[in-house]
């Protein structure tokens, strides 16, 4: 047992109720099929998890659907005490837990490594604060001790249907909140931020982290959330709009030339496929002589741990 794990367990167990693994996943995925049911219209997607087959010689990872009526037995047989089990916050069509098969999101989950008692306390100073303030974070539904840090669960009041455009938007939202959450020297002891897919699998509650010999333990820290609640903590361009239609542009080349003449000249005529460079001289000698300074001010929420003094120097 690491010092980080021990300190975080003592802190959380003194303030929040512990939730067992069986109950945790029953609450997370209340709509799983019963064994033997077959819905060909994809109306009942299931959670899918991976577990290490301790009986096989090669200790191979095997995939299994999470069924409602057999979950108690399956949890004790395949998850509890297992050295490696993985499950995401999504439900899938068919048995493969691939992103293209993902149909609903029940929870948005974050992996935060390098969390000790000091980092955990800093997180709680930020959880539930004013979303307009820098680095404030939504209050999670559950915190899970992973052995090396925390798994942060935001469980939705209603699952999110994963249309292709919604998957893309949720990825942007997760990346935005990951940046807010992971701050070296404050909320994590690890410098490099780890950005993960919305389809990422996480070690399951009640299983063991075989690298550290610790059990994954969950604590209920808050309520279920809505997309609007999470959106409030992200930049406007990274928020999820479930009503936003996904349709490719039907604009013709002639219409694009008329509507976006500068872009057309640069990309179509001149073949410049790279990103447009910022014309600093043109900005400074244009309407805003302090354009560069104002640009740096807008980056205040993007500064990574270890670079704050450089940011202040630029100002």
Question: Which role fits each region the language model picked out?
Answer:
Residues 1-107, 117-122, 129-134:
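DNA replication initiation on ssDNA origins
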Residues 4, 17-20, 169, 222, ...:
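Non-membrane alpha-helical secondary structure
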Residues 70-71, 185-269:
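Catalytic "initiation/cleavage/transfer" segments centered on a nucleophilic residue
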Residues 104-106, 148-150, 310-312:
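Residues at beta-strand starts and edge strands
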Residues 110, 136-165, 169, 195-209:
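Histidine-centered divalent-metal-coordination microenvironment in nucleic-acid enzymes
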Residues 113:
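Anionic group-transfer/hydrolysis microenvironments
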Residues 118-130, 156-186, 212-232:
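Helical (often loop-to-helix) elements that flank the catalytic cores of nucleotide-handling enzymes
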Residues 158-160, 241-315:
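Modules that initiate DNA replication and primer synthesis
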């Amino acid at each position: 047992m690491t010092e980080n794990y021990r300190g975080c367990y003592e802190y959380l167990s003194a303030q929040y109720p512990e939730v067992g693994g069986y109950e945790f996943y029953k609450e997370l995925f209340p709509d799983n099929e019963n064994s033997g049911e077959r819905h060909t219209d994809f109306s009942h997607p299931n959670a899918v998890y991976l577990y290490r087959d301790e009986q096989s010689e090669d200790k191979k990872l095997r995939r299994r659907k999470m069924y409602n009526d057999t979950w108690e037995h399956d949890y004790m047989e395949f998850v509890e005490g297992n050295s490696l089990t993985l499950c995401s916050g999504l439900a899938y069509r068919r048995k493969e837990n691939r992103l293209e098969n993902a149909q609903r999101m029940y929870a948005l989950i974050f992996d935060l490594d390098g969390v000790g008692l000091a980092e955990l306390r800093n997180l709680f100073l930020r959880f539930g604060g004013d979303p307009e303030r820098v680095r404030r974070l939504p209050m999670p539904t559950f915190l899970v001790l992973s052995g090396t840090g925390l798994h942060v669960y935001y469980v939705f009041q209603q699952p999110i249907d994963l249309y292709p455009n919604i998957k893309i938007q949720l990825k942007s939202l997760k990346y935005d909140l990951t940046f807010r959450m992971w701050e070296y020297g404050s909320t994590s002891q690890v410098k490099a931020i780890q950005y993960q897919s919305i389809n990422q699998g996480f070690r399951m509650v009640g299983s063991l982290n075989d690298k550290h010999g610790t059990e994954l333990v969950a604590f209920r820290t808050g309520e279920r959330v809505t997309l609007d609640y999470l959106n409030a903590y992200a930049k406007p361009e990274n928020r999820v709009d479930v009503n936003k239609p996904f349709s490719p542009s039907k604009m013709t080349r002639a219409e694009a030339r008329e509507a976006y003449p500068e872009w057309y000249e640069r990309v179509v005529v001149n073949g410049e496929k790279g990103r447009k460079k910022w014309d600093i001289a043109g900005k400074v000698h244009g309407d805003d002589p302090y354009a560069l300074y104002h640009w740096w001010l807008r980056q205040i929420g993007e500064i990574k741990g270890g670079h704050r003094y450089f940011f202040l120097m630029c100002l």
